[in-house]
């Protein structure tokens, strides 16, 4: 009798995706982040569901309902902080996952990569709307500033912003619709993640060398299930260290002040994982230019497969490209730092230089480095 996991219509899908999946024998820990993102998503949906049971999306009660969750609901504080810091862990894993894709040339799987870019954008939208829900000062002003950017769109901009707001300012209608979208988007993300996986399993995984591994495959279970479990344990450990010891480390103290439309905080800034894009936005003095740069800073990822000029897929044997990659990482860290600083003398010029470097590395220096390496192969 054939094993039921190979014949049952539902178990067959699980089996082909997580048990008998032929996997390259040499994939490193950089390939752990896909499963970690899945765990983060499940964790966020579960904690979010329990938070939604006690949260009210009305401007008069939103802030106090979050306080109520932390003070009066059994283990409400841990659910709330796991959700808030879970978002940070989610983005750490996302950035690592994208970085892995860039370094090892995984972007040559076009469908998988493009769905990944859509997933990144959807996750960013979800996180932004979630940040508005506690209705603190930074929630309100963050929502005001970011939605206002759409007014830079010629002709329809102002109408578009007021349509999103549901009025002439960020108010009850805005908060209610943001809650609705914040609730539904994670399920859309789940569906997209399944499509992401579907396309990945059409081609099979890439590996650190970037060379076809069809001649050397091993079953996903038990080899990579046990490896993933180690990653999950480390992820949960890091998350719980954050939640139990420094739950507000990555948050903004301004968000403990209820939203007040009459009082603007001195420094409006988003959560840390958006700071790099925020720095690029601020580095351009023109509003429309800034918005375009902001959008392009993420959408540029969709161009990466077309900028690949190297004869080799992975950067494993390409030292010049490796240097470029790590300069790009340093540049993104610089942008993240600048995004959290006030708009004054040294920071403005550093932000502008870092923004130019970001686009220059991806659009010019990396393809040039690849071409140089191609020529060096002929020597």
UniProtKB/Swiss-Prot annotation:
Binds 2 heme b groups non-covalently. A ubiquinone binds at residue 201. CDD domains: cytochrome_b_C, Cytochrome_b_N. Its cofactor is heme b. Keywords: Electron transport, Heme, Iron, Membrane, Metal-binding, Mitochondrion, Mitochondrion inner membrane, Respiratory chain, Transmembrane, Transmembrane helix, Transport, Ubiquinone. Coiled coil: none annotated. SUPFAM superfamilies: a domain/subunit of cytochrome bc1 complex (Ubiquinol-cytochrome c reductase) (SSF81648), Transmembrane di-heme cytochromes (SSF81342). It comes from the Eukaryota. Heme b b562 binds at residues 83, 182. Heme b b566 binds at residues 97, 196. GO terms for cellular component: mitochondrial inner membrane; respiratory chain complex III. It is a multi-pass membrane protein. One of its GO terms (molecular function) is ubiquinol-cytochrome-c reductase activity. InterPro entries: Cyt_b/b6_C (IPR005798), Cyt_b/b6_C_sf (IPR036150), Cyt_b/b6_N (IPR005797), Cytb/b6-like_sf (IPR027387), Cytochrome_b (IPR030689), Cytochrome_b_C_euk/bac (IPR048260), Cytochrome_b_N_euk/bac (IPR048259), Di-haem_cyt_TM (IPR016174). PANTHER family: CYTOCHROME B. Belongs to the cytochrome b family. Heme 1 (or BL or b562) is low-potential and absorbs at about 562 nm, and heme 2 (or BH or b566) is high-potential and absorbs at about 566 nm. This is Cytochrome b. It comes from Capricornis crispus.
């Amino acid at each position: 009798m054939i094993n039921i996991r190979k014949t049952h219509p539902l178990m067959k899908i699980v089996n082909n995706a997580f048990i008998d999946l032929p996997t390259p024998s040499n994939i490193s820990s950089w390939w752990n982040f896909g499963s970690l993102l899945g765990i983060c998503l499940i964790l966020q949906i579960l904690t979010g569901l329990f938070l939604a049971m006690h949260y009210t999306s009305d401007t008069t009660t939103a802030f106090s309902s979050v306080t109520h969750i932390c003070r009066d609901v059994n283990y409400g504080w841990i659910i709330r902080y796991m959700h808030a810091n879970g978002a940070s862990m989610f983005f750490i894993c996302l950035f690592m996952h994208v970085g892995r894709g860039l370094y090892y040339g995984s972007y040559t799987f076009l469908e998988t990569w493009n769905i990944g870019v859509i997933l990144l954008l959807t996750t960013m939208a979800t996180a932004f709307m979630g940040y508005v829900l506690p209705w603190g000062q930074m929630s309100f002003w963050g929502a005001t500033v970011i939605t206002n950017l759409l007014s830079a769109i010629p002709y329809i901009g102002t109408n578009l912003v007021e349509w999103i707001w549901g009025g002439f300012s960020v108010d009850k209608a805005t908060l209610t619709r943001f809650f609705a979208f914040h609730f539904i988007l994670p399920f859309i993300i789940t569906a997209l993640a399944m499509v992401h996986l579907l396309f990945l399993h059409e081609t099979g995984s890439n590996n650190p060398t970037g060379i076809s591994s069809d001649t050397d495959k091993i079953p996903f279970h038990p080899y990579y299930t046990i490896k993933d479990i180690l990653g999950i344990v480390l992820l949960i450990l890091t998350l719980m260290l954050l939640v139990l010891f420094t739950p507000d480390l990555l948050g903004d103290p301004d968000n403990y002040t209820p939203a007040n439309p009459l009082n603007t905080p001195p420094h409006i800034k988003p959560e840390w994982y958006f700071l790099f894009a925020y720095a690029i936005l601020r580095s351009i003095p023109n509003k429309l230019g800034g918005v375009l740069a902001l959008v392009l800073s993420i959408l540029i990822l969709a161009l990466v497969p077309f900028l690949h000029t190297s004869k080799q897929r992975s950067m494993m044997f390409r030292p010049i490209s490796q240097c470029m990659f790590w300069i790009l990482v340093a540049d993104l860290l610089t942008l993240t730092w600048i995004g959290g600083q006030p708009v004054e003398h040294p920071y403005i010029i550093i932000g502008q230089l870092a923004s130019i470097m970001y686009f220059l590395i991806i659009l010019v220096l990396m393809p040039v480095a690849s071409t140089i390496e191609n020529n060096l192969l002929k020597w």
